[in-house]
């Protein structure tokens, strides 16, 4: 009974991997991506003042992963924009979400049950893009493991890794939102997923690509749908990382504490703390006193 079950599972995975993503899954991907753009502060006002800048930001949200991957592989960063069907579909989604009368389209797609369906469909596209990125890099660099991982990672992370550049287009600069320093769950999951696909592509992971695509897609769908439904930002990897990271990379607090304890006394005698910086109110008070003395 185990062999027929395995055959049925393999056939299911193969059938799932052969399902085309255009236009339905791509449309869902664009809808969720542009929705997240509209959630950004000032995005609606920007769409009224500068529709072209808003459209550029929307295209980055939809095609940022392709731009980064092409840059990594030395190809034209605007190569994907030759796909007229995808660009027109993404443009139509952007226009409907931002400019549909009475916000009807936005209200429909942001309705939570409908949005959860689109979120699940977006994860299907994300995993396909990771697998395609690793496969594309393997075709050019057969033994370049890190190139495969980097290409698959940027294919799955999308505009998250370009968030600071996208913010500049919106006239916002928030360097503390650097995605590499503070990885969100999709970025981190894309990184772990591209490692698995790289191992599979180099025959170190004894599983077919169709099965890996199927199971990793199911994992991403379950996690993202649950996090979206519960409005949670907690990473499912946090418990494992909390156990492994201190073992391999040490504790941040303990390492820095011991370092300061060893060198703190030697610097204490020679180091003179700078005078406290005066606040704006104190500076204004001093200015008023000097003016009063001059008047006297």
Swiss-Prot record:
Ca(2+) binds at residue 74. Homotrimer; conformation seems to be controled by binding to diacylglycerol (DAG). This is Trimeric intracellular cation channel type A. Keywords: Ion channel, Ion transport, Membrane, Nucleus, Potassium, Potassium channel, Potassium transport, Sarcoplasmic reticulum, Transmembrane, Transmembrane helix, Transport. The chain crosses the membrane at residues 20-37, 52-73, 86-103, 108-126, 145-162, 184-201, 210-230. GO terms for molecular function: identical protein binding; potassium channel activity. Residues 278-287 have a biased composition (Basic and acidic residues). It comes from the Eukaryota. It holds the Pfam family TRIC.
